[in-house]
Amino acid sequence: MAQHTVYFPDAFLTQMREAMPSTLSFDDFLAACQRPLRRSIRVNTLKISVADFLQLTAPYGWTLTPIPWCEEGFWIERDNEDALPLGSTAEHLSGLFYIQEASSMLPVAALFADGNAPQRVMDVAAAPGSKTTQISARMNNEGAILANEFSASRVKVLHANISRCGISNVALTHFDGRVFGAAVPEMFDAILLDAPCSGEGVVRKDPDALKNWSPESNQEIAATQRELIDSAFHALRPGGTLVYSTCTLNQEENEAVCLWLKETYPDAVEFLPLGDLFPGANKALTEEGFLHVFPQIYDCEGFFVARLRKTQAIPALPAPKYKVGNFPFSPVKDREAGQIRQAATGVGLNWDENLRLWQRDKELWLFPVGIEALIGKVRFSRLGIKLAETHNKGYRWQHEAVIALASPDNMNAFELTPQEAEEWYRGRDVYPQAAPVADDVLVTFQHQPIGLAKRIGSRLKNSYPRELVRDGKLFTGNA
């Protein structure tokens, strides 16, 4: 694999020499950092099983190497990466997999280790959505996830990825993560804090990642991380699990943050060792039971993961002084909900008791039941999935609902050819050789729902959202 030149400040190299255990070679560390990062993907098991995905993609000649800590994760090698970007493949467009760095799959593996099955989870720093979507798949779209993102510009990306993967059990918020301890104390069974960090572990992906690095900035970042983990710990219920992770390598932002929490709440913090998380995990194990992953150990990004249990309640923080404002939705009454469900079933949309119907003016939404306890405590950017808009002639079903709820075995499903599917993703109407009979057509490709179309004569009117329309070369190889 080709080398690339990474910029290393001298003070960083000194710090790494001190931080690296004697069992590891510093020369191996430098050599690993100069190698470009291996690409990796995670199969979205909400859409397809790993076995079916491997069968579907077998003709492509992809080399898929299993990632030891994630059953759905694979390192991927492709001969035609330049000819067709991974993100333009049909399987990516329909949400069958997520392009995710291998080591970033570790925190969610830790969160669900030892049979942990949380029902209400918070992802404190969620964008772009790799870990939120991984959590949802582990929960099988049940329970509820609060996915928070402080950066306004990244909330839109977070929602796009959640929608593409067919996820229905997520509520999005846009806050500084330090508010949650006071706003929603002891509300979560599990919390993932993948903390903002100095990014020392990402040099294989970004050779200039350390251009603005300094020991002083590490100290400032660590101070913020302590405030974030303190807030998250308050939001965790007694008995709950907190996973703290970063993509950096210094101890100040990693071990020291977790040790600070234990010193602050000595009777309430228990470190849960991760040495048995996967075969070979002990190679990265610290004396506290954390995983400090230097890039040469597993040939991946540098990463840090700690798992903690809250063994008892801690003193509450002062209640927040802000007002959340009125919640603009109201529950749909049972009789009307039955009518809506019947109409939705007619176009192939079905949901279970984990989701409940709510209404705002002419909009119909499905919210995860597990999030209702948070209504009035935080303001949501987006909640659940938008099912439909009502109009005089019935319902205008929404694309995100089709992707999350549609059954490809429904009688109104219509399978497109590769050329027709590509036209669909380009936002164009489709003219199939044999037009379907139904007026409302569930459009599928590779037996996966990709949208809902109106049949007008021999034409299928495209309803693919404009913001998702793709240009350039797609999976048939035509530009």
Curated annotation (Swiss-Prot):
Keyword Electron transport found: no
UniProt cross-references to InterPro entries, sorted A to Z: Methyltr_RsmF_N, MeTrfase_RsmB-F_NOP2_cat, MeTrfase_RsmB-F_NOP2_dom, Nol1_Nop2_Fmu_2, Nop2p, RCMT, rRNA_ssu_MeTfrase_F, RsmB/NOL1/NOP2-like_CS
EC class of the enzyme, as a word: transferase
Primary subcellular site in the record, as a coarse category: cytoplasm
Known catalytic reactions: cytidine(1407) in 16S rRNA + S-adenosyl-L-methionine = 5-methylcytidine(1407) in 16S rRNA + S-adenosyl-L-homocysteine + H(+)
GO cellular component, one term: cytoplasm
Active-site feature positions: C247
GO molecular function: RNA binding; rRNA (cytosine-C5-)-methyltransferase activity
Keywords assigned by UniProt, alphabetized: Cytoplasm, Methyltransferase, RNA-binding, rRNA processing, S-adenosyl-L-methionine, Transferase
Top-rank taxon, per record: Bacteria
Subcellular locations according to the entry: Cytoplasm
Keyword set includes Transmembrane: no
EC number: 2.1.1.178
Binding residue positions for S-adenosyl-L-methionine: A125, A126, A127, P128, G129, S130, K131, E149, D176, D194
BP GO annotations: rRNA base methylation
Annotated SUPFAM superfamilies: S-adenosyl-L-methionine-dependent methyltransferases (SSF53335)
Protein family: Belongs to the class I-like SAM-binding methyltransferase superfamily. RsmB/NOP family.
Function noted in UniProt: Specifically methylates the cytosine at position 1407 (m5C1407) of 16S rRNA.
Name the UniProt record assigns to this protein: Ribosomal RNA small subunit methyltransferase F
Organism of derivation: Escherichia coli (strain K12)
Gene that specifies this protein: rsmF
